[in-house]
């Protein structure tokens, strides 16, 4: 009888502990939603305003005028090199405030709020998948010694990510002797069965399987053949750990996050990555003479 009583008490204690943990998680999620909601409402209101074409053209035009003048860079053949961060264009026929867009915005803001990665902190060693053979690996498997590792999260249906891929590829070509680069293909930013935009260069539905994700990644790989590419898992473990949706840049060195770029589209700046790499290159090899 005593043994049965102790067993019953132990079972009750386990249930009570489980209930307490669930309650704490629920309270934490509720508190985070209360913190995120004002930010989400502000973004939703801005998207609603941008659906008025006169406001959209005024705000986007003012943003372009407010950007600093870009110094023209020439390649070895004397041809002008496109800018690192071409302005984000939004076609007039795109609606920005829809149920699909609000879901995507909430998803991105929630991932950013709960992310494990923070500049100056340890880099999450989240799981990724090789496109060939679907072998599971981890992000830090691609870090070699003290060499910086650049992480570039994105997808084919994200217009800013694709528009800046050529600039990213130029940095890969220029700095790959001292720096490693890794593209992580994540869930689609603008899937054809979700938040659709006519500015997306490709029409790709949401990934239902790793086979879907690798098919989309193959398209991207054609434009970045010199850079290693892996897939995020179907549970989006890397995108969640790094708050990378819609797109994002990171630099890891010796297991520490040395640079955390802003969340796309506005915070995704290849020019910031270039500045960091230039400074790192100067530390290694001294300042390079500027071409006149």
Swiss-Prot record:
Q: Which organism is it from?
A: Ovis aries
Quick check: keyword Transport in the entry?
A: no
Supply one GO molecular-function term.
Answer: thyroxine 5'-deiodinase activity
What does the UniProt function comment say about this protein? Plays a crucial role in the metabolism of thyroid hormones (TH) and has specific roles in TH activation and inactivation by deiodination.Catalyzes the deiodination of L-thyroxine (T4) to 3,3',5'-triiodothyronine (rT3), 3,5,3'-triiodothyronine (T3) to 3,3'-diiodothyronine (3,3'-T2), 3,5-diiodothyronine (3,5-T2) to 3-monoiodothyronine (3-T1), rT3 to 3',5'-diiodothyronine (3',5'-T2) and 3,3'-T2 to 3'-monoiodothyronine (3'-T1) via inner-ring deiodination (IRD). Catalyzes the deiodination of 3-T1 to L-thyronine (T0) via outer-ring deiodination (ORD).
Report the GO terms under cellular component. endosome membrane; plasma membrane
Instruction: Report TM segments.
Output: 31-50
Q: Which UniProt keywords apply?
A: Cell membrane, Endosome, Membrane, Oxidoreductase, Selenocysteine, Signal-anchor, Thyroid hormones biosynthesis, Transmembrane, Transmembrane helix
Name of the protein in its database record:
Thyroxine 5-deiodinase
For this protein, the record's InterPro entries field holds: Iodothyronine_deiodinase, Iodothyronine_deiodinase_AS, Iodothyronine_deiodinase_I/III, Thioredoxin-like_sf
Q: What class of enzyme is it?
A: oxidoreductase
- Catalytic activity annotation: 3,3',5'-triiodo-L-thyronine + iodide + A + H(+) = L-thyroxine + AH2; 3,3'-diiodo-L-thyronine + iodide + A + H(+) = 3,3',5-triiodo-L-thyronine + AH2; 3-iodo-L-thyronine + iodide + A + H(+) = 3,5-diiodo-L-thyronine + AH2; L-thyronine + iodide + A + H(+) = 3-iodo-L-thyronine + AH2
Extracellular topological domain ranges are 51-292
Subcellular location as annotated: Cell membrane; Endosome membrane
Tell me which parts of the chain lie in the Cytoplasmic compartment: 1-30
Query: What gene is it encoded by?
Result: DIO3
Q: Which family does it belong to?
A: Belongs to the iodothyronine deiodinase family.
Per the record, the GO terms for biological process are: hormone biosynthetic process; thyroid hormone catabolic process
Presence of the UniProt keyword Transmembrane helix in the record: yes
Q: How is this protein situated with respect to the membrane? A: Single-pass type II membrane protein
Q: What EC designation does it have?
A: 1.21.99.3
Subunit field text: Monomer. Homodimer. May undergo minor heretodimerization with DIO1 and DIO2.
Q: Which residues form the active site?
A: 158
User: What SUPFAM superfamilies does the database record attribute to this sequence?
Assistant: Thioredoxin-like (SSF52833)
